[in-house]
């Protein structure tokens, strides 16, 4: 509890970054920075450049014990407790320069990695990898929980999940208690002759009424959420049409289509792994993102040009089927700026897994500039 309490006051950027897919690739850094790639067992550093600029990554010679990504993340995660070792939040590395010794030569990490190397990998995941991932605020490998909610709908889904989980835990505890008591009280040593019960009015009434009451408590809170999910904004600020293809997405901003010569439409393909640039995620990055303004009511019209697809973005709490010959629509309200990733969620053929969706929410000013550049 002491470790968790102190770590909650610290930051989890270290663990999140070390477990992210793009950790083994590249990183935007400022000044003479360095980070350790545990997947390739190498440390990387960049030449000095102005803050916020991309830099070419070169290899240096710093080695660490072979403890696996989850062990290294756990050691880094716990090292935030040490006040003398000033660990860095990689999500804000542009503001706080990263020093090589803070990552690879940190005595706390070296000591922990030496000890963690002796622990079985499964135990390292259970004690370190999973807790570190559970506290992340971005999609991660082996993620156990939800992504951060960026819309009221997603927040409502998470709240409903927690409410239902409360009842599920109580049911689980009750069933385990009844099962354990039955196994213990009616074991062969105590009751060598089994009792035969063929009818019980009381228990039949109980197991009919109680589940009905529980289902009511679970269903009633979901009514408001279901209604809000189907609610369509009467006058949305922006309307976007998403068209599914095998195997890419097309987008049309109908509000700016004044003529055939002036329109805002583009195709969005997945970026191949060999073409990924600084900070881009494998199998999730696209060449053309859907750019929308934050804190604005949006409407997305979804259809398909060939087979069934599904337009889904977990952080936004949206998932809508793209059906050929049919136009479905969803409404959303993104509460903060950010980049949100999704994928086609309906099996649509060979390259179904290579149809990512990237929604970038920006400020109204930046959105206006983007639209102007696209139309020109």
From Swiss-Prot:
TM region positions: 164-184, 205-225
Concerning InterPro entries, the annotation shows:
CcO_II, CcO_II-like_C, CcO_II_C, Copper_CuA, Cupredoxin, Cyt_c_oxidase_su2, Cyt_c_oxidase_su2_TM_dom, Cyt_c_oxidase_su2_TM_sf
- Binding, Cu cation A1: 309, 344, 348, 355
- Chain ranges on the Mitochondrial intermembrane side, renumbered to this chain: 226-376
Cofactor remark from the record: Binds a dinuclear copper A center per subunit.
**Which membrane topology describes this protein?**
Multi-pass membrane protein
The domain of life is: Eukaryota
Residues binding Cu cation A2: 344, 346, 348, 352
Indicate where this protein resides in the cell. Mitochondrion inner membrane
Binding-site positions, Mg(2+): 346
Catalytic activity, reaction form: 4 Fe(II)-[cytochrome c] + O2 + 8 H(+)(in) = 4 Fe(III)-[cytochrome c] + 2 H2O + 4 H(+)(out)
Quaternary structure and interacting proteins, as annotated: Component of the cytochrome c oxidase (complex IV, CIV), a multisubunit enzyme composed of a catalytic core of 3 subunits and several supernumerary subunits. The complex exists as a monomer or a dimer and forms supercomplexes (SCs) in the inner mitochondrial membrane with ubiquinol-cytochrome c oxidoreductase (cytochrome b-c1 complex, complex III, CIII).
Q: What function does the entry list?
A: Component of the cytochrome c oxidase, the last enzyme in the mitochondrial electron transport chain which drives oxidative phosphorylation. The respiratory chain contains 3 multisubunit complexes succinate dehydrogenase (complex II, CII), ubiquinol-cytochrome c oxidoreductase (cytochrome b-c1 complex, complex III, CIII) and cytochrome c oxidase (complex IV, CIV), that cooperate to transfer electrons derived from NADH and succinate to molecular oxygen, creating an electrochemical gradient over the inner membrane that drives transmembrane transport and the ATP synthase.
Q: Which family does it belong to?
A: Belongs to the cytochrome c oxidase subunit 2 family.
UniProt name for this protein: Cytochrome c oxidase subunit 2, mitochondrial
- Organism, per UniProt? Vigna unguiculata
């Amino acid at each position: 509890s002491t470790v968790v309490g102190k770590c909650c006051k610290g930051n989890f950027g270290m663990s999140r970054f070390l477990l992210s897919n793009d950790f083994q690739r590249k990183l935007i850094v400022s000044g003479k920075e360095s980070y350790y790639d545990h997947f390739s067992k190498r440390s990387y550093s960049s030449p000095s450049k102005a803050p916020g600029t991309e830099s070419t990554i070169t290899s240096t010679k710093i080695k660490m014990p072979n403890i696996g990504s989850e062990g290294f993340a756990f050691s880094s995660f716990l090292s935030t407790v040490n006040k003398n070792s000033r660990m860095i939040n990689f999500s804000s590395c542009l503001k706080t320069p990263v020093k090589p010794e803070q990552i690879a030569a940190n005595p706390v990490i070296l000591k922990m990695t030496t000890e963690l190397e002796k622990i079985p990998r499964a135990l390292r995941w259970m004690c370190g990898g999973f807790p570190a991932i559970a506290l992340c605020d971005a999609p991660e490998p082996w993620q156990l929980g939800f992504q951060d909610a960026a819309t009221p709908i997603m927040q409502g889904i998470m709240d409903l999940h927690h409410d239902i989980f409360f009842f599920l835990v109580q049911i689980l505890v009750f069933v385990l208690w009844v099962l354990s008591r039955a196994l213990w009280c009616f074991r062969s040593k105590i009751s060598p002759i089994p009792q035969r019960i063929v009818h019980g009015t009381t228990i039949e009434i109980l197991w009919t009424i109680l589940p009905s009451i529980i289902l009511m408590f679970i269903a009633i809170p979901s009514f408001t959420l279901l209604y809000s999910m189907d609610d369509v904004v009467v006058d949305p600020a922006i309307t976007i049409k998403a068209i599914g293809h095998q195997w890419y997405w097309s987008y049309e901003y109908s509000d700016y289509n004044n003529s055939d010569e002036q329109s805002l439409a583009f195709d969005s393909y997945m970026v191949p792994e060999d073409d990924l640039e600084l900070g881009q995620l494998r199998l999730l990055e696209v060449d053309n993102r859907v750019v929308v303004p934050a804190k604005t009511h949006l409407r997305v019209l979804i259809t398909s040009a060939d087979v069934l697809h599904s337009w889904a973005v977990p952080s936004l709490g949206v998932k809508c089927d793209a059906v050929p010959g049919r136009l479905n629509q969803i409404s959303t309200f993104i509460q903060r700026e950010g980049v949100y990733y999704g994928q086609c969620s309906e099996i649509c053929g060979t390259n179904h897994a290579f149809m990512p969706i990237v929604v970038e929410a920006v400020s109204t000013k930046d959105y206006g500039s983007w639209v102007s550049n696209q139309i020109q």
